[in-house]
Design a protein with these regions (language model features):
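A broad "non-catalytic interaction surface" signal
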Residues: 1-162
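C-terminal outer-membrane/trafficking sorting elements
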Residues: 166-206
C-alpha cells in the first residue's frame, strides 16, 4: 500500500508525460539547437510536446548553444539526455540545469541562449533529449512530476564521435624535407586512420 514508488517510471518504449499548463505563455514557443529548429511551436497539448521526429547530430565532448523562447518570464529550464535508452531521465543524464529565461519578468516574449556539453564518453547513437520548464521554481528532480505552469518537449539526438584533433597530435606532425627538394615530401603523424592533406604555395594557391 501507500504511495511510495520509484522516482521515475516508464512504459515500454515511452517516456513519462507530465501534464503541465502552458496556455498563458509558459513553456517553450521555440527551441533551436544543432540542426533542430522548432520555432513557433506554441503550447503543446497538456503541456507535453513529442517532437522526437526532429533529430540532430551532436558530438562527444562538444558544447552547443540552445536558443529558447517563451511567452512568460521566469521559466526555469532543465534538460536531460537518455543516454542509456531506458526511457527514464536521471540525475546523471542532466546536461542543462536551472537555466532561467526572462528572470523576474512576466507576460511577453522572452528569449535566452544556454549552452550544454555532451560528455566525452557519452554513448554513441540515437537518444531522446527532454527539455522541461517550470514557472518561478526549479524543474523537479523527478521528470515525471508535474508543476502548475510550464511545458515539456522531447527531441532526438544522435551522438557521434568528435572530429576534433588534439594539440598533441598536431605537435607530433613531421613534414620533410624542408625546404622541399623536388616533388616528393614525407609526412609523419601520430594520427591514426585516414588523413586529408591540402598543399598551398607561398601565395596561398593550392
Amino acid at each position: 500500500g501507500g504511495n511510495d514508488g520509484p522516482d521515475q517510471w516508464s512504459t515500454l518504449g515511452l517516456t513519462c508525460q507530465p501534464a503541465l499548463n502552458c496556455t498563458v505563455g509558459d513553456g517553450f514557443n521555440s527551441i533551436v539547437f544543432g540542426d533542430i529548429d522548432n520555432s513557433d511551436s506554441g503550447c503543446s497539448a497538456n503541456g507535453f510536446g513529442n517532437f522526437t521526429d526532429l533529430s540532430t547530430d551532436l558530438a562527444q565532448g562538444d558544447t552547443y548553444d540552445v536558443s529558447m523562447e517563451t511567452g512568460y518570464g521566469d521559466q526555469h529550464v532543465r534538460a536531460w539526455i537518455d543516454f542509456n535508452d531506458d526511457y527514464n531521465y536521471t540525475a546523471d543524464e542532466i546536461v542543462l540545469d536551472n537555466y532561467i529565461i526572462g528572470e523576474g519578468q512576466g507576460s511577453g516574449t522572452h528569449t535566452g541562449t544556454a549552452q550544454f556539453t555532451i560528455p566525452a564518453d557519452a554513448t554513441l547513437g540515437s537518444h531522446y533529449i527532454r527539455f522541461a520548464s517550470a514557472w518561478q521554481t526549479g524543474v523537479p528532480d523527478n521528470p515525471c512530476e508535474a508543476t502548475s505552469w510550464g511545458e515539456t518537449e522531447e527531441y532526438t539526438v544522435n551522438i557521434v564521435e568528435s572530429l576534433g584533433i588534439s594539440d598533441v597530435d598536431l605537435l607530433n606532425l613531421r613534414i620533410y624535407p624542408n625546404p622541399v627538394d623536388g616533388n616528393n615530401v614525407t609526412i609523419l603523424s601520430s594520427v591514426s586512420g585516414d588523413k586529408f592533406v591540402e598543399v598551398f604555395d607561398i601565395n596561398g594557391r593550392k
